[in-house]
Amino acid sequence: MKIKTNKINSANAQIEAEIPRTTIDANIEKIAKNLTKTASVQGFRKGKVPVTVIKKQYGERLIQDAEAEALREVLNKGLDELKVAMSALIGEPNISKFDKSDDKIEVTVKIAMRPEINLENYADMVAPFKKPVISDKEVEDRLEKLADSQGKFVDLKKKRAAKDGDSAIIDFEGSIDGELFEGGAAQEFALVLGSNQFISGFEEQVVGMKIGEEKVIKVTFPESYGSEKLAGKDAEFKVTLHNIQEKVKVEIDEAFAAKMLAGQDDKSLENLRAQIKLQLENEALAKLYNEELKSALLETYVEKINFDLPEFVVEQEIDVSLNRKASTMSEDEIKELRENADKLQELRETFRLDAQKSVKATFIIDALATKEKVRVDENEVMQTIYYEAMQMGQDPRLAYDKYKNAGYLPAIQMSMVEDKVLTQILNSKIKEA
């Protein structure tokens, strides 16, 4: 068996081999002899089946198994020559050539290896930045919102028209072109005016109504509305206002603080303000990270950390982009690409740069996670999916199973690792204002 190897770079290599017919024949003989011990053939006792019978009954399978064994030998010898461990390979080896003739098989195997990434100066690529400053006014505004959320609605002491901030107790019945639609009606529904709970224009038209008043409210569902049957449609709602309630203002004092800090040792108003300030700082920092610093840091790493990329991983990423593009194309456009290989390749090339950046970013994050000792286990992924599902009013178990069955869990886990590792690196560079 002749073998020739070529290590293209640290992430890609190629193995070329000539497998003599004698090697395949020897493999067939060996596999057939082993089968004589286990094969069940009618008319023969187990373990007593002649090799000639085995070859006749399992002919094509024997050839396939013999060729597969020869390919494994090619791969093992090639890796030994390249001094590459099997564990360093990424994905399955790609057999790009398999030409059979009477006396030999000519084979070319392309392999991809986990790239070598130098992270020696990664911490120096992060510029120190100042922690967001929270003003006293921001703390007081949040404190007032907290107090407002604790207020209770009570019936009006003196009758008046409904205004923003009131809870309007209404019956409503919606129709489109005179036809009632599902989910468009309710009785004695408590609607807080100004909460934007209903579609734009509805609450504004309840403002000014008086108890006992009936009114037809006209609105238009937004084009982006969740129900396709309602999106962009004009609708009319028959509304009856039964009652108006106003919110009783909660005093911001030590008693209020004690209620909000129940279970804590320090129940003072001063501590409540301190905790609100800390919460606002964390929110501002998270916003800064998510909207600016994380993406900028990853872009810096992609630009400055250079290493060889496994070709087949880049091609897979291009395939994803191409499939996404194809889903937006017409049948004629897709047909044209199928019939014109040059045009298809030209389109693939438009995705190459972004694909390379995406693959590079993935390997960098993986290497950084190892360096920073960051990991996300399956339980963390489940908790994240459960939390987001509950936030959206969905069944957490069904949401998790949906992602799992669709094969999305690894991508979610990788996204969480990215978020965690970049946050950890950025946290080490915060400067107090």
From Swiss-Prot:
The text the record gives for the protein's domains is: Consists of 3 domains; the N-terminus binds the ribosome, the middle domain has PPIase activity, while the C-terminus has intrinsic chaperone activity on its own.
Record organism? Sulfurimonas denitrificans (strain ATCC 33889 / DSM 1251) (Thiomicrospira denitrificans (strain ATCC 33889 / DSM 1251))
Family classification: Belongs to the FKBP-type PPIase family. Tig subfamily.
Put simply, this protein is called Trigger factor
| Record-level GO BP terms | cell division; protein folding; protein transport
Organism ancestry: Bacteria, Pseudomonadati, Campylobacterota, Epsilonproteobacteria, Campylobacterales
Q: Where in the cell is it found?
A: Cytoplasm
Q: Name one Pfam family in it.
A: FKBP_C
Known function: Involved in protein export. Acts as a chaperone by maintaining the newly synthesized protein in an open conformation. Functions as a peptidyl-prolyl cis-trans isomerase.
What is this enzyme's EC?
Answer: 5.2.1.8
Query: Which InterPro entries does this one have?
Result: PPIase_dom_sf, PPIase_FKBP_dom, Trig_fac, Trigger_fac_C, Trigger_fac_C_sf, Trigger_fac_ribosome-bd_bac, Trigger_fac_ribosome-bd_sf, Trigger_fact/SurA_dom_sf
Q: Which residues form the signal peptide?
A: none
HAMAP family in alphabetical order = Trigger_factor_Tig (MF_00303)
Q: Which PROSITE patterns match?
A: FKBP_PPIASE
Single GO MF descriptor: peptidyl-prolyl cis-trans isomerase activity
Q: Where is the PPIase FKBP-type domain?
A: 165-250
